[in-house]
């Protein structure tokens, strides 16, 4: 060959030099990789030079290499093959007639060859110049490789289909180079076991042997022992290659598998000259071999094992089949609620999605875990409280027994719908009178107007809070003072039957409380937070109730809503506090619920939260609380309510003799201590003439004392229940309420529970907002909220339908409260809570019974306040500029209404024999 062939040994990067005998002269040639021939002429020239230079002398030289002889038991020694020797010239792949990379095979002379045969595949390959070039180059590239690793190279220049066993080495001139056959690459390494000594011997022999003349094409191989049959062509993948008779097929097959394993380890992807298939199939085949080798070596990668679900929770999915007009996947409880709600089939078909949202909202706001039930603000707290205390026991002369009676109604049995119960429990829905223990009967406390029947599930919710009654003792007050007047504490049995409805009407309205509860239900952590909030709300409601009861507005016991809200709460003041607490709790719970849900554990979140947050909360409280003992600053404590974590009292400030409301809480019983801090901070920042103001707070002996302004007149509920108000008086109440809301909204606070129960009056007619338990804070980043809180009957449509809402929810509630002042009760109060929610969601703006008797200005005021679309609804600032505000009267005109309400309640109480 004219070109140099450079071969790289697998184990050595150095170039090997071969000394090959030549008929003319010896020359050491450095074999370098031959560049692909550019013309067919070069191939032709190479073939001619091979024919002319290969002679018997070269073969004799090969036979004289005694150093390469092997013992009978030793594997055949490996010798370097000529650059054109077939890669398969090994025991398994004896060289068959090799072909040159020319366009047509060269026929050897008859004197030089005994026989020569080309297989059809070989001939086909010869006919393809590109393929010949490729095969020729690869063949050259592998000859040296095999010279080092094959034990013997048997060149069978002939034997195609005839399988003739003729030894090509027996001829003086072997035509090995005349025709180069291609072999399956899988046979590259087939041969005897690897022999390192043979390789070294071969290297020495090559150095000692003479080289061929320039241009000669070496094709020498080791001599075959006498008697050894010349191996025949063998190919696994091509009919052109035949199996040697010298080796059994089984042994060859075994060796072939070993060779394939070695090939698989080679990173090279080149195609060898002995491949009989197209390059592409060859690559695919090698890839398959590599994959198989790697899978056997590394093993099949393990697939991730997915276990079965642990602790699965079934979540009900309710759908609606428009074809049949029926709900799908409706739980039995929901079916019962729908059937008992009074929602007709026609209504269901018209608004199926709304019904689903309303039911979900109702369930979320009414169902709570057992923990929450225990925390329900004033539910069984009353039993522990003595009902005997007389009005005289009350420190404030303004507080009459009848005032306390209203509180009893508030205690109305838990039979009231869930919503009412929520109000009872911890909400200050009826701040005027905290709910008495259900056991006590208070006929006088029965509300004058009927309330809707409580939902079946709601009654169960009323959980006794009696265990908390002992907490009140923390104030060291005489039982008489602790207890409200007998009327106040007497559990209204009658009120139980009547109050359930009444309470539901007002207390049920306390959906907020329920809402807070549902949130807690959803998450134990939330539940714990809600419980704390309820306790706080209960206390706040108790204060409000106490204030209302003392002012006489509590006498409004007839108002069925208040009794319901108060049922869960203890005394009136308790109810007030409890409400704020409940409301606050609900609101705070919702706000805190989000952050606190994580920290609070499920069943015992309270304890854990206390343990984890106790020290931090106490430290924070010490920073914001005043030093000193409240018992030394205030005197004449009178208990007016009971909450889950403490009681609500009235007291007089020493020196000034100012009457205040005191909320006492046992920190150890507070599941969410951080909520307390939030409530105190909100109250401190909400100082306004139309907001019940925060006076001071003390941390004493593990108990937190919160001192607030006390409103003797009680809540607006008593006023609207026992009196008919003029538009001027209604306008005055709306104005004062709007001023308080404007202040809250300016600070990014949403009250979320505006209703008559949370509007307190003084004996002079001053009006202030209370019960901030459900307050929520919004900011630029979060100007909408989605938590469901508030009282069902006063709720805005966007809240009922579980949509985002903002400050405008308070405006809607104000409009409903205006209707309440007109009609004595809010719309849908006689409906079950679920149906009320349904009507709010579907009817939008409620219809006023005697709208014709209202002035156009008043109707226009309500028109803007009760817009279903919150974007079109007026703001507090807008309504304060409405013409309706021109009808406002002096607040002193409200004083007679407050006194009349107190008297009416006292008379009602007397009629009941209490």
From Swiss-Prot:
This protein's record includes keyword Nucleus: yes
PROSITE patterns referenced in this protein's UniProt entry, alphabetically: CRIB, PROTEIN_KINASE_ATP, PROTEIN_KINASE_DOM, PROTEIN_KINASE_ST
EC code(s) of this entry: 2.7.11.1
Keywords per UniProt: ATP-binding, Cytoplasm, Kinase, Nucleotide-binding, Nucleus, Pheromone response, Serine/threonine-protein kinase, Transferase
Assigned protein family: Belongs to the protein kinase superfamily. STE Ser/Thr protein kinase family. STE20 subfamily.
Annotated stretches, region: Disordered: 1-140, 156-184, 251-286, 408-615
Residues that bind ATP: 640-648, 663
Keyword Membrane among record annotations: no
Protein kinase domain span: 634-885
Amino acid composition bias (Basic residues), ranges on this chain: 156-166
Reactions catalysed: L-seryl-[protein] + ATP = O-phospho-L-seryl-[protein] + ADP + H(+); L-threonyl-[protein] + ATP = O-phospho-L-threonyl-[protein] + ADP + H(+)
Result after altering residue 253 to R: In strain: Guyane 11
Compartment list: Cytoplasm; Nucleus
Primary role: MAP4K component of the MAPK pathway required for the mating pheromone response and the regulation of cell polarity and cell cycle. Phosphorylates histone H2B to form H2BS10ph. Is involved in conidiation, aerial hyphal growth and infection-related morphogenesis.
Protein name per the record: Serine/threonine-protein kinase MST20
Low complexity composition-biased segments: 13-26, 63-72, 79-97, 516-548, 562-576, 587-596
Active-site residues, as the UniProt record annotates them: 753 (proton acceptor)
A GO MF term: histone H2BS14 kinase activity
GO BP: any one term: negative regulation of transcription by RNA polymerase II
One Pfam family cited in the UniProt record for this chain: PBD
């Amino acid at each position: 060959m004219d070109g140099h062939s450079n071969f790289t040994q697998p184990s050595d990067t150095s170039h090997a030099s071969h000394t090959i005998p030549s008929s003319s002269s010896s020359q050491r040639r450095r074999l370098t990789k031959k560049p692909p021939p550019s013309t067919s002429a070069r191939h032709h020239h190479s073939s001619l030079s091979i024919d002319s230079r290969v002679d018997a002398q070269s073969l004799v030289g090969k036979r004289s290499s005694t150093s390469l002889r092997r013992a009978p038991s030793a594997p055949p020694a490996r010798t370097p093959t000529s650059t054109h020797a077939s890669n398969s010239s090994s025991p398994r792949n004896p060289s068959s007639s090799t072909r040159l990379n020319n366009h047509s095979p060269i026929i050897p002379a008859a004197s030089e060859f005994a026989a020569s045969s080309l297989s059809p595949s070989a001939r086909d390959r010869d006919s393809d110049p590109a393929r010949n070039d490729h095969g020729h180059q690869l063949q050259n590239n592998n000859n040296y490789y095999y010279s080092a690793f094959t034990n013997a190279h048997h060149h069978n220049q002939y034997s195609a289909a005839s399988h003739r066993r003729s030894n090509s080495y027996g001829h003086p001139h072997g035509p090995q180079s005349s025709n180069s056959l291609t072999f399956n690459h899988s046979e590259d390494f087939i041969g005897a076991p690897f022999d390192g000594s043979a390789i070294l011997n071969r290297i020495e022999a090559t150095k000692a042997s003479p080289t061929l003349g320039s241009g000669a094409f070496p094709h020498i191989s080791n001599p075959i022992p006498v008697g050894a049959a010349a191996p025949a062509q063998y190919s696994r993948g091509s009919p052109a290659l035949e199996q040697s008779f010298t080796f059994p097929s089984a042994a060859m097959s075994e060796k072939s598998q070993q060779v394939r394993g070695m090939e698989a380890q080679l990173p090279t992807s080149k195609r060898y000259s002995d491949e009989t298939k197209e390059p592409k199939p060859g690559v695919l085949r090698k890839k398959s071999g590599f994959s198989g080798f790697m899978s056997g070596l590394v093993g099949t990668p393990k697939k991730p094992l997915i276990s079965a679900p642990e602790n699965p929770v079934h979540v009900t999915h309710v759908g609606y089949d428009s074809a049949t007009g029926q709900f799908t996947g409706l739980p039995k409880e929901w079916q019962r609620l729908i059937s008992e709600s009074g929602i007709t089939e026609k209504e269901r078909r018209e608004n199926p999605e709304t019904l689903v949202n309303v039911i979900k909202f109702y369930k979320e706001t009414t169902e709570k875990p057992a923990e929450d039930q225990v925390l329900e603000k004033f539910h069984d707290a009353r039993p522990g409280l003595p009902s005997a205390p007389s009005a005289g026991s009350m420190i404030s002369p303004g507080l009459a027994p009848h005032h306390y009676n209203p509180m009893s109604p508030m205690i109305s049995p838990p039979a009231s719908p869930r919503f009412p119960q929520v109000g009872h429990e911890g909400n200050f829905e009826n701040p005027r009178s905290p709910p008495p223990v259900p056991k006590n009967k208070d006929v006088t406390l029965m509300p004058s107007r009927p309330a809707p029947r409580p939902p079946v599930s709601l009654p169960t919710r009323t959980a006794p809070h009696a265990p908390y009654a002992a907490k009140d003792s923390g104030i060291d007050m005489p039982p008489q003072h602790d207890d409200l007047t007998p009327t106040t504490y007497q559990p209204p049995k009658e009120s139980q039957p009547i109050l359930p409805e009444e309470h539901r009407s007002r207390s049920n309205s306390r959906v907020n409380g329920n809402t807070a509860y549902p949130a807690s239900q959803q998450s134990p952590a939330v539940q714990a937070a809600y419980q704390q909030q309820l306790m706080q709300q209960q206390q706040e409601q108790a204060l409000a109730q106490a204030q209302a009861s003392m002012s006489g507005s509590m006498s409004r016991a007839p108002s069925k809503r208040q009794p319901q809200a108060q049922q869960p709460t203890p005394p009136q003041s308790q109810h007030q506090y409890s409400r704020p607490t409940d409301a606050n709790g609900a609101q705070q719970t919702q706000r805190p619920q989000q952050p606190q849900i994580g920290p609070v554990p499920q069943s015992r979140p309270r304890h854990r939260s206390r343990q984890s947050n106790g020290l931090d909360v106490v430290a924070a409280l010490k920073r914001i609380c005043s030093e000193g003992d409240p018992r030394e600053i205030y005197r004449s404590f009178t208990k007016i309510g009971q909450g889950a974590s403490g009681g609500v009292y009235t007291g007089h400030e020493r020196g000034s003799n100012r009457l205040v409301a005191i909320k006492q809480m046992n920190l150890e019983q507070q599941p969410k201590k951080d909520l307390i801090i939030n409530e105190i901070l909100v109250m401190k920042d909400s100082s306004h003439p139309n907001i019940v103001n925060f006076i001071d707070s003390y941390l004493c002996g593990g108990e937190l004392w919160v001192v607030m302004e006390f409103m003797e007149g009680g809540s607006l509920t008593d006023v609207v229940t026992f009196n008919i108000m003029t538009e001027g008086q209604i306008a005055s109440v709306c104005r004062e309420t709007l001023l308080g809301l404007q202040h809250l909204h300016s600070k990014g606070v949403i009250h979320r529970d505006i209703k008559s129960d949370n509007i307190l009056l003084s004996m002079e007619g001053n009006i202030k907002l209370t019960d901030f338990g459900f307050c929520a804070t919004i900011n630029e980043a979060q100007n909408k909220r989605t938590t469901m809180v508030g009282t069902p009957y006063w709720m805005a449509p966007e809240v009922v339908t579980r949509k985002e809402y903002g400050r405008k929810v308070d405006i809607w509630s104000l409009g409903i409260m205006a209707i309440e002042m007109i009609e004595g009760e809010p719309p849908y109060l006689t409906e079950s809570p679920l149906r009320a929610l349904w009507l709010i969601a579907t009817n939008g703006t409620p219809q006023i019974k005697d709208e014709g008797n209202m002035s156009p200005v008043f109707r226009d005021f309500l028109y803007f306040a009760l817009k279903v679309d919150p974007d079109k609804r007026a703001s507090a600032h807008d309504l304060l500029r409405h013409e309706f505000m021109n009808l406002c009267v002096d607040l002193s005109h409200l004083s007679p209404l407050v006194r009349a309400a107190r008297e009416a309640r006292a008379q009602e109480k007397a009629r009941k024999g209490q």
